[in-house]
Amino acid sequence: MGRCLTKKVFLIQSPILFLHLLISLSSGAVKPDLKGVCVSKGGRFPPYELEGKPPKSVGRGSKDLTLCRVFRKKTCCSSVQTNPAFVAVRNLATYGEASQECLELFELLECSICNPNVGIQPGPPRICASFCDRVFEACKDAYFASNALKRVIGPCGVNDDIICIKASNWESNGTSFCEAAGFAVQRNDDSREKPCYGSKASLESVVESWSRDSRKETPLKTETLSCFKDLLQWVREMTTIQKISLGMSFLIAGMFLIRQSNNRNQKQRLAAIQRTARRLRGNGNGDSYSAAINRRTSSD
């Protein structure tokens, strides 16, 4: 693909990678010596299983997080928290008519509960007002519904079609939108006494850390990642007909490789039989046996 088509592949062109970057950038100034214990958020957020214990890493496999996995190295979350967040994002994608940017930012908002700094703070997740404004601006035309039981708004679900309206009809700005969704909002993003999720200071510190990690990558890893991004973008931009054609090409190529492998295996088996025949030439029967094998090979 001409050295992977191009080197200029931006993360924003790949929604999955862009989302992971957004989560990393908004993860707050997570420090290795983070102290404190997990405090359940109350409201619509399920209690932490680590209530009263410090945040810890989450293993992969059956105990892995169903969402927000960027925080698995240090978090108060378990699947108890990420399952509802996963459902909310899925509903927004399925019924909310949300843009890609809205989906990414709303998932980032839902994942705030898994940020270790947020986990040790009392009360609902404290979100920076500037970040709430970004989420609302991206999601104001997406459809949300009011949950009468939990007294919050959330993405429309399968049973919410009657009272499903645009976010801009529920609230008029980012602060009221976040509060209506069950979050606390902090107006001063740069407060050191009370850090909030998505502050400018935390973004800059994590960007610097992320840049250091990126420079440590080997050229081979960087090249491989670039190739993967280019291939992913190329496939996304293909039409349905082109994707079907590409799939058929892969199928035909696979069948050709299987046939080649079978032919090679058959030749290897015949060669082994011939070697055995040559070892038997010491007796009379061996010569006739070898001749028979040679005739079989010639006929094939």
From Swiss-Prot:
GO cellular component, one term: membrane
Localisation per UniProt entry: Membrane
Segments crossing the lipid bilayer: 238-258
Matching Pfam families: Folate_rec
Keyword Signal: yes
Topology with respect to the bilayer: Single-pass type I membrane protein
Entry superkingdom: Eukaryota
Induction description: Induced by salicylic acid (SA), correlating with the accumulation of folates.
Signal peptide: 1-28
Gene Ontology terms, MF aspect: folic acid binding; folic acid transmembrane transporter activity
Tissue: Expressed in leaves.
InterPro entries named among the record's database cross-references: Folate-binding_rcpt-like, Folate_rcpt-like
Main location class: membrane
Alphabetized UniProt keyword annotations: Disulfide bond, Folate-binding, Glycoprotein, Membrane, Receptor, Signal, Transmembrane, Transmembrane helix
Record-stated family: Belongs to the folate receptor family.
Function: Folic acid-binding protein involved in salicylic acid- (SA-) induced folate accumulation by triggering uptake and accumulation of folic acid in cells. May be implicated in the transport of the folates from the site of production (leaves) to the site of storage (fruits and seeds) and utilization (roots).
Name used for this protein in its record: Folate-binding protein 1
Native organism: Arabidopsis thaliana (Mouse-ear cress)
